[in-house]
């Protein structure tokens, strides 16, 4: 689908960029701060905590969709072209979107992950992009974003630095809370089984093994052989629970649950925060929800 529509989108976006590329967007609509656009909701929340009321923040990928599968529409590129800066996770998450923006707009594209010790994919070339599932990595994101915002908008430096300091403290408290919570799970039951093996950063940070039906961005997802392998692992480890993601088709993990006789303990958030009313509307609340779900399911 991406290959089919690529040329068409390029032509549309080129027209959009030509219409607005000569105009310097400068600051946000109120004459202060910056117009900030980012790729997905988790980064949007992080940026809002740092930018505060000084700058406006919007994100492209709707909640509930996966950033690496999202098909941008022309209005998305219009928003990016009108922005002062476009922040992306990097590590291959938004690679093709990033290339399109760089080829059709003068807006600066900034990766927030250059200081991350990235994990390589296990079954293919490339890097695992889900670094935000380790809170310490998000703290590194905050430092990169803070420094970049201060450089772009020196008049707002005091606001950005103060907001980042407060948010870093909140993240440190979250990090300590997670470590406290996972100690309640018996060590032999600290294995997270999920559809897409996206929790490797979380596992390395907090002492879990992780198992996915498929690896990230796999062209073969949910094959009988993949499902059978995971069912065997669940039975062999005598795990009390498996889990599903909010942005992934649940039918595959339902099959694993049925074939292994092990219940699905709940949904976790991987590539997006929760919708309003979910209790997981922010990155911090999302992580707390995930940890509570893992602890409840694996402590049985």
UniProtKB/Swiss-Prot annotation:
Amino acids binding Mn(2+): 68, 130, 196, 271
Record InterPro entries: AdhesinB (IPR006129), Bact_metal-bind_prot9 (IPR050492), Lipoprotein_PsaA-like (IPR006128), ZnuA-like (IPR006127)
Identification of the protein by name: Manganese-binding lipoprotein MntA
Family per record: Belongs to the bacterial solute-binding protein 9 family.
Intracellular or extracellular location(s): Cell membrane
Lipid tethering residues (N-palmitoyl cysteine): 20
Disulfide bonds: none
GO terms classed as biological process: cell adhesion; metal ion transport
Lipid-conjugated positions (S-diacylglycerol cysteine): 20
Signal peptide segment: 1-19
Role according to the record: Probably part of ATP-binding cassette (ABC) transport system MntABCD involved in manganese import. Binds manganese and delivers it to the membrane permease for translocation into the cytoplasm.
GO molecular function terms listed in the Swiss-Prot or TrEMBL record: metal ion binding
Pfam families in the record: ZnuA (PF01297)
Membrane topology, as annotated: Lipid-anchor
Organism of this sequence: Halalkalibacterium halodurans (strain ATCC BAA-125 / DSM 18197 / FERM 7344 / JCM 9153 / C-125)
GO-annotated cellular components: plasma membrane
Alphabetical UniProt keywords: Cell membrane, Lipoprotein, Manganese, Membrane, Metal-binding, Palmitate, Signal, Transport
